[in-house]
A protein has these predicted regions:
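Extracytoplasmic/peripheral linker and loop segments enriched in polar/acidic and small residues
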Residues: 372-374, 398-461, 481
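Periplasmic-binding protein-like
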Residues: 269-311, 354, 441-446
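Gly/Pro-rich hinge or "lid" segments in bacterial periplasmic/extracellular proteins
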Residues: 151-211
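Structural transition elements
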Residues: 298-337, 353
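Long beta-strand-rich cores associated with HINT superfamily self-processing modules
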Residues: 457-481
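N-terminal lobe/hinge region of extracytoplasmic solute-binding protein
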Residues: 32-82, 111, 182
């Protein structure tokens, strides 16, 4: 009798393991993501943080780097007659606490961003460079620059420049606000964010899904949950699932360019790397495809240009020569200038995982002694260093100027082209000048492009209308069930 009971219990247990998941709740979307580093929008640099804050906030505008097209969002218009004096007209809007979004909201928020030195502060201090920002009236922001610039629409579309409510601007309780953020976007956070667990987004305008349950977890487990039908969207595809995604989710997965890229920066002031021939030799010795499949875990593409797709003014034809892997040519270039051999590649925070295998690859392909070492607290390096750039805006000016600064590259023609692109009257004119500046960097090669990051998501059969953008990732407000 006892054995029959055990058999029955085992049968029931097996049936429970094999049972289909509970039916999904109507109107509720479930989304898996990593733990965001912060939900303070001006300090967000990670993909998970941008996904959440892009649902909680609406930026002034969307800017497409490839076409130069500006789509007003929280602003009704962004205009200038001389590219020095800019006027931003706001569309009517409210924060989730019911208070109005005004021009003063932006003025005070931007002052706080600059004062707190958050990740997006450089957009204001280094790129916008305004002499004065004022609220002309409750719905009008007036900006006066220190020079003519046509890049203002691209800069003001930065997701880190969204407004904060008066309550936190008065209290300065930034940590508390990051746990329970209040934005001006289509979704509000229902309660506080629960670290390690997630949170619930609520939409009250009657459009799209009314509720999104955000679930923090492991990307591989989330991928498998979508496949099993217990999760609607997984916002990251780990390398271990890369090869099976087409078979598992035919027509229900997407990749998109992220505003992030990796570079090898050369110390152009150092005698051994002052010759561009040496720098080109090292660039040709990098097996980018091996890095992509190995250390980068299929989360990036081998670089094809200096400007990554998320930041480029249109598509570049073909792969740039320094982006190619040609070990024989690289060795020949080093032999041509009698490179003495022996080099250290320095890595900073967050780049060691790919810097070490890159160094091993250079040693093998170029047949010179190359070692990896943590970057010391000095600007005077005697070897190349790895650089992981996380962009705050879709303007190429941000990246090109940052790369020149990182390498110590100083050239009058490059500076003139960059300044002319910044001042250009139209996106087309600016794009041509940015390409000239990019081509010059590819010729002189103070930095070698290594990889550009991409996002990759999968979704269940009941999710529809999934679209993506470089900075927000998946547009949660566009999904329907």
């Amino acid at each position: 009798m006892r054995s029959r009971v055990l058999v029955l219990l085992a049968a029931f247990a097996l049936a429970g393991c094999m049972a289909a998941p509970d039916p999904s709740r109507p109107g509720v979307l479930t989304v898996g993501l990593r733990e965001p580093a912060t939900l303070l929008p001006a300090d967000v640099t990670d993909q998970a943080g941008r996904l959440v804050t892009s649902a909680l906030w609406t930026p002034l505008a969307d800017y497409d780097a490839a076409s130069g097209k500006l789509t007003p969002r929280a602003a009704s218009s962004i205009t200038s007659a001389d590219r020095v004096h800019w006027t931003v007209k706001l569309a009517p809007g409210r924060f989730h606490d019911g208070t109005p979004v005004t021009a003063q909201s932006y003025v005070d928020t931007w002052a706080a961003v600059a004062a707190e030195h958050w990740a997006s502060s450089a957009v204001l201090t280094n790129l916008l460079r305004a002499k004065e920002i004022t609220a002309a009236d409750p719905s009008t922001i007036s900006i006066t620059l220190d020079r003519p610039s046509g890049q203002v629409p691209a800069l003001l579309s930065a997701p880190g420049l969204v407004p904060l409510p008066a309550s936190v601007l008065a209290s300065h309780d930034w940590n508390g606000f990051a746990r329970a953020p209040v934005g001006n976007g289509p979704f509000r956070l229902n309660g506080a964010w629960q670290p390690g667990s997630g949170g619930t987004l609520q939409r009250d305008d009657g459009r799209g899904v009314t509720q999104i349950d955000l679930k923090v977890g492991d990307p591989a487990a989330q991928y498998d949950a979508v496949k099993a039908g217990t999760l609607d969207v997984a916002t990251e595809v780990p390398g271990s699932r890369h090869e099976s995604v087409d078979a598992d989710f035919a027509g229900r997965h997407a990749t998109w360019a992220l505003p992030r890229a990796g570079y090898l920066v050369f110390p152009v002031a150092d005698g051994r790397f002052s010759d561009a021939t040496v720098r080109h030799g090292f660039a040709l010795g990098v097996d980018r495809s091996a890095l992509e499949a190995g250390a980068l875990d299929h989360q990036a593409e081998p670089a094809k240009a200096l400007l990554p797709p998320a930041d480029a003014p249109g598509e570049r034809t073909g792969t740039c020569r320094p982006c190619s892997f040609d070990a024989a040519a690289g060795k020949a270039l080093l032999a041509q200038v009698a490179f003495p051999g022996g080099a250290t590649v320095y890595f900073g925070p967050g780049t060691e995982t790919w810097a070490r295998p890159l160094t091993v690859g250079l040693h093998k392909s170029l047949d010179v002694s190359v070692t990896a070492q943590g970057k010391p607290a000095t600007n005077a390096l005697d070897g190349p260093s790895t650089l992981d750039v996380k962009l705050a805006t879709p303007s190429p000016y941000e990246l090109l100027s940052a790369l020149a600064t990182a390498s110590g590259y100083a050239d009058d023609v490059f500076r003139e082209n960059l300044a002319a692109a910044d001042a250009a009257a139209t996106p087309d004119e600016a794009g041509q000048l940015y390409r000239l500046a990019e081509n010059q960097l590819l010729r002189d090669l103070p930095v070698a492009p290594i990889w550009s990051a991409h996002g990759h998501a999968v979704w269940s059969a009941r999710a529809h209308g999934v679209t993506t953008t470089p900075f927000a990732g998946i547009t949660l407000a566009a999904i329907t069930l």
